[in-house]
């Protein structure tokens, strides 16, 4: 159980004089790990050090949910100015390198600092001042959707950082799994050499030190891990409360330990496994499915769609029962066009929310929150609804074995009743076909020729005609059983253009051919 906040506050006050006397000149916060995942919006931070009776989470991290994270270590940030500069810089969208330059400009102790910063744009920096105790150094990188900064001082050696990096890169699962594995990898190499080797010469024994056993020997005395997800709430940031005090998806803090307590990374693993156990059967922010069908519609004020949600837990298992309170609103960045209906609980862990397109053009994003009675879970990435469509299909796929029909709705220029021609391609949508002043988003192939020759046939119904006065029209693509057997796995793209004269080309819609 986490120590009550008022007790932690009293401890900090009681230890303030000790911290300043014993740490201000040569404070060491040993290794820290900052990871972000741009695709999920997660920010993960972990840190450990060989200091007794200390709350590392109060002094080191900066957590900005959905924005980025940082750590200030080696020389204690007693004024809070370093962490506040990171906080404000991330909030303003400043690049981590520019934030470091800002800190260097006002900090007289920059030579003794070690700082890591990563933002949600994937930019990462790791700075190690020349005054940091050996072994000291760090790495930063951007690999796919993951960016990270890992740094440490008074370590047993570079393997502490290097092996933590490999754990980040090679561990499967979400950022919580990656962070836990990276903390354990660092600890397995001895971590803070003052605990595993020598207080006066932390890097003199090797990494890991001879005979070091991470199951029984100590790599640190205190440690923390936190993961912020979209929907979590930032705390504040100043010298009295720290900058990692919000409400987070994962928040484990092993503080105020002594040399007689078990290694804090071992304690983190125990707490982590218990936390994971409690997440079984609960909706996961990221793995829960959410999609709008159809994904696009015209912004005509009447087009209907459905936002469909299925609750999935962190192991990828459907929750399987209803009962969650579902709230849906337009997310940040949404065009806020569509009207949102009342959620429908299907009783099996799936929910449907009716949508009605608004009048106008743009893309809506929806913030879906499932509250299962334990805590609210905000689903991410936000599902999108594109209200700029000038062509839609009521199906996303057709079965080659069964055949079927794709009903195609055209939404073009109003008032002029222009002639149109709808075509189909099996070769993609880009770069498309230039026709007069427009580009029709279909690549020319034999299917385009076939759709032209068979226009207004039993297969391509009403694909050559005139739009109505309101700019709408309806067409169909219909196939019998096994007629598409040779196109299994292909995407059939449809688009139309107006002609006589050519003035307009629609978007493309894709129908996948399945077995």
What are these regions (language model features)?
Residues 2-17:
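Bacterial N-terminal signal peptides that target proteins for export
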Residues 329-348, 353, 462:
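Low-complexity "stalk/linker" and mucin-like segments enriched in Ser/Thr/Pro/Ala/Gly
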Residues 388-515:
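Residue-level hotspots within well-ordered secondary structure
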Residues 362-372, 422, 492-496:
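Short, aromatic- and glycine-rich surface loops/edge beta-strands on solvent-exposed regions
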Residues 276-317, 325, 332-337, 369-390:
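Short S/T/G/P-enriched beta-strand
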């Amino acid at each position: 159980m986490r120590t009550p906040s008022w007790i932690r506050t009293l401890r900090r006050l009681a230890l303030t004089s000790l911290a300043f006397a014993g740490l201000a000149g040569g404070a060491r916060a040993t290794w820290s790990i900052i990871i972000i995942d741009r695709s999920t919006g997660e920010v993960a931070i972990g840190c450990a050090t060989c200091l007794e009776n200390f709350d590392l989470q109060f002094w080191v991290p900066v957590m900005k949910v959905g924005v980025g994270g940082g750590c200030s270590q080696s020389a204690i940030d007693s004024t809070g100015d370093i962490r506040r500069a990171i906080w404000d810089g991330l909030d303003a969208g400043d690049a981590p390198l520019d934030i470091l330059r800002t800190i260097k400009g006002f900090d007289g102790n920059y030579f003794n600092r070690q700082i890591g910063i990563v933002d949600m744009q994937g930019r990462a920096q790791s700075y190690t001042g020349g005054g940091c105790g050996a072994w000291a150094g760090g790495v930063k990188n951007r690999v796919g959707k993951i960016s990270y900064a890992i740094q440490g001082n008074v370590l047993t050696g570079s393997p502490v950082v290097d092996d933590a990096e490999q754990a980040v890169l090679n561990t499967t699962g979400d950022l919580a799994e990656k962070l836990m594995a990276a903390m354990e990898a660092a600890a397995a190499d001895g971590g803070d050499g003052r605990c595993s080797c020598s207080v006066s010469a932390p890097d003199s024994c090797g990494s890991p030190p001879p005979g070091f056993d991470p199951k029984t020997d100590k790599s640190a005395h205190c440690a923390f891990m936190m993961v912020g997800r979209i929907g979590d709430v930032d705390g504040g940031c100043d010298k009295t409360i720290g900058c990692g005090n919000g409400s987070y998806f994962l928040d484990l803090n092993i503080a105020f330990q002594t040399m007689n307590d078990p290694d804090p990374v071992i304690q983190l693993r125990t707490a982590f496994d218990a936390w994971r156990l409690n997440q079984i059967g609960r909706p996961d922010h990221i793995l829960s499915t959410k999609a709008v069908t159809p994904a696009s519609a015209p912004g005509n004020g009447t087009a209907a769609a459905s936002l469909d949600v299925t609750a999935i837990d962190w192991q990828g298992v459907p929750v399987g029962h209803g009962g969650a309170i579902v709230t849906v609103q337009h997310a940040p960045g949404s065009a806020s066009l569509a009207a949102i209906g009342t959620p429908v609980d299907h009783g099996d862990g799936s929910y449907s929310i009716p949508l009605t397109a608004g009048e106008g053009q743009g893309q809506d994003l929806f913030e879906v929150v499932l509250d299962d009675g334990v805590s609210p879970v905000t689903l991410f990435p936000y599902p999108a609804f594109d209200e700029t469509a000038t062509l839609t299909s009521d199906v996303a796929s057709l079965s080659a074995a069964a055949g079927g029909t794709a009903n195609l709705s055209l939404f073009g220029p109003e008032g002029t009743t222009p002639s149109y021609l709808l075509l189909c391609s099996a070769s993609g949508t880009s770069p498309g076909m230039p026709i007069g002043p427009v580009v029709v988003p279909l690549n020319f192939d034999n299917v385009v020729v076939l759709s032209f020759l068979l226009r207004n046939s039993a297969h391509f119904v009403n694909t050559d005609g005139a739009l109505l006065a309101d700019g709408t029209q309806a067409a169909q693509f219909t196939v019998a059983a096994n007629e598409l057997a040779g196109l299994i796995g292909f995407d059939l793209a449809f688009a139309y253009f107006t002609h006589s004269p050519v003035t307009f080309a629609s978007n493309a819609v894709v129908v996948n051919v399945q077995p």
